Design a protein with these regions (language model features):
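Fungal secretory targeting signals
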Residues: 1-18
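Soluble FAD-dependent oxygen oxidases
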Residues: 2, 18-558
Length: 558
């Protein structure tokens, strides 16, 4: 019996090296102490071994704190245990990376990728940890931690790429008079947050298209997922703005990627005045409030037709929601560039007129019109947020076309389901910023085309305290996946999902996330990463792998 065990153990590491990513204890592939020391010396001294530590308890709800640590993640549902937590009596690394490289330049990244390849290690990449899907972590992985890769922000009055190339302007976009973009640009030299980039752009009297959560990294998953913004209706999706990347490939080579150099990779990386309104109930009637919410959805095409864009949030029950009102209310804020208050008010008159009858049905409709001196002030006063972290959250989202937004019956059914029940902490965030520049046929992108065809992105989520028992957590996950998410998909079966604010448990994620772009993206990944060094949950190519419980990542065809 002992001899049989020894035979199995001696064969298993060899099989795992071919079919699974290496994990601690694999004698054949896991790096020895000598190899690790040599690797650390080559960096030099930037290799970190991650060890669970109870002292993080006091800073668990700080996004900035999580950003400063290689295993700090804003939303903890994907981790092995919550701190302070109610589901575990002890804490281990779980799915967090085993080692991290504190990279400060491209050469560090190159060395890390080559080391991971040599030892068949899983690779994770993390900047700030603002990640709803668990894409920046991985069991027993080597993490490339980019938080301290900061080589400056540079403003260019007139852009010229390193390869004398710029993407062509899409037809219909205001032209500079040249066939290629030659206007102003900003080089973001590494791991800067949107808060830092916004401030820098403001000092240059410029506007950048970026996220509303200002602690999010400006370069990374936000742009690769597309990136929605308060200014996108006027300027386009965030990834449309990218002129050039400097990229470290899976083989460790550093290359320039733009519309003339490595164009297929450039295409893949570009993938994926104000009028606030408030709608609240003066008596505790869920039914009348949801009628009003459904009517409000019907006004969103009118808001966009008035050349305004922005966001709304609503909740049907009092609760501790993360991103929406904590009482029964719908709040929204929409802005327009170079518009007077009188002009905005006149443009919004049809919207107000459609909502006004709700005042006689127990609703309280309020509209306020405010002028701001510049976009920077407007954005920070109205839209910018740091978002409370350290709680667990699961969400789903759906793009809605105009046809869905005028279907009163179907809208009311969706609103009733997504509103949820008391105690669920269910809430909805609505991005009303489609059309305009978003709808332009921009070249060299692999954004899901349904985004450009849609007017609204509707996000539904639930969050729960870290002391929630496992069965309660599982119920919330199933509710978002099979009830609320299914309701959104029933309303808009032919659209898709914004992949950065999505459900990592979505059983149909390949279609919902990528749509018709999937074959193109898979071909590009195979070309640049034939051995699948890069993997993340729900990312392109992830369907060919499976994660063992508390174990390695393995190929499905094994």
């Amino acid at each position: 019996m002992v001899g049989w065990k020894l035979v199995v153990l001696s064969i298993l590491p060899c099989l795992r090296a071919d079919t699974c990513k290496c994990v601690p204890g694999d004698a054949v592939c896991w790096p020895t102490e000598t190899a690790l020391n040599a690797f650390n010396a080559s960096l030099p001294g930037k290799l970190i071994q991650n060890i669970p530590c109870a002292t993080i308890q006091t800073n668990w709800n700080s996004s900035l704190f999580h950003a400063w640590f290689p295993t700090g993640y804003d939303y903890s549902y994907a981790l092995n245990c919550d701190i302070p937590g109610g589901n575990t009596s002890s804490c281990s690394l779980g799915d967090s990376p085993y080692y991290a490289v504190n990279v400060t330049n491209a050469n560090d990244i190159s060395l890390a990728l080559k080391f991971a390849t040599q030892h068949n290690m899983r690779v994770a990449i993390k900047q700030t940890g603002h990640d709803f899907l668990g894409r920046s972590t991985g069991y027993a992985s080597l993490e490339i931690w980019t938080h301290n890769l900061r080589q400056g922000l540079t403003f260019h009055d007139s852009y010229l790429s390193t390869s004398q190339c710029s993407p062509q302007e899409p037809e219909g976009m205001e032209s500079t008079g040249a066939a290629l973009w030659a206007g102003s640009a900003i080089t973001i030299g590494g791991a800067y947050t949107w808060a830092e980039v916004y401030q820098f752009a403001h000092e240059q009297n410029a506007i950048v298209v970026g996220g509303t959560c200002t602690g999010v990294g400006a370069v990374g998953g936000y742009l690769q997922g597309g990136g929605h913004s308060a200014s996108m209706r006027d300027f386009g999706i965030a990834t449309d703005q990218v002129l050039e990347y400097t990229v470290v490939l899976a083989n460790g080579n550093v290359v320039t990627v733009n519309a003339c150099s490595n164009t297929d990779l450039f295409q893949a990386l570009r993938g994926e005045a104000v009028a606030p309104m408030e709608l609240s109930s003066t008596r505790p009637s869920k039914h009348s409030f949801l009628d009003a919410v459904a009517t409000w959805y019907e006004t969103t095409p009118m808001i966009l037709e008035a050349n305004l864009g922005g966001y709304a949030g609503w909740a049907a029950w009092d609760g501790d929601t993360l991103l929406a009102p904590k009482v029964r209310r719908l709040e929204s804020a929409f802005g327009g560039f170079n518009r007077s208050v009188d002009d905005i008010q006149e443009s919004m008159a049809p919207v107000v007129a459609k909502l006004a009858p709700l005042n006689s049905k127990g609703m309280n409709i309020m509209a306020e019109y405010i002028a701001f001196p510049d976009y920077f002030t407007y954005f920070h006063d109205v839209h910018a947020n740091s978002m409370n972290v350290g709680q667990s959250i699961i969400m789903t989202s759906r793009f809605l076309r105009s046809t869905q937004l005028i279907n009163s019956t179907a809208l009311r059914q969706m609103v009733n389901v997504t509103a949820g029940l008391p105690g669920q902490n269910a809430f909805t965030v609505v991005g009303v910023n489609g059309g305009g520049a978003v709808a332009l046929d921009v070249p060299n992108t692999t954004i899901n085309p349904v985004w450009r065809q849609s007017l609204v992105n509707n996000l539904v989520a639930r969050n729960w305290p870290d002391t929630a028992p496992y069965l309660e957590v599982k119920a919330a996950q199933d509710d978002i996946t099979y009830v609320k998410g299914a309701s959104l998909e029933s309303l808009a079966p032919d659209t898709g999902t914004y992949i950065n604010e999505a459900n990592y448990k979505d059983p149909n994620y390949l279609v919902n996330f990528y749509g018709t772009t999937r074959p193109t993206l898979e071909a590009i990944k195979k070309n640049y990463d034939p051995n699948d060094l890069f993997y993340c949950v729900t990312c392109i190519g992830s369907n060919y792998w499976y994660q063992q419980a508390n174990g390695p990542l393995c190929r499905k065809d094994s």
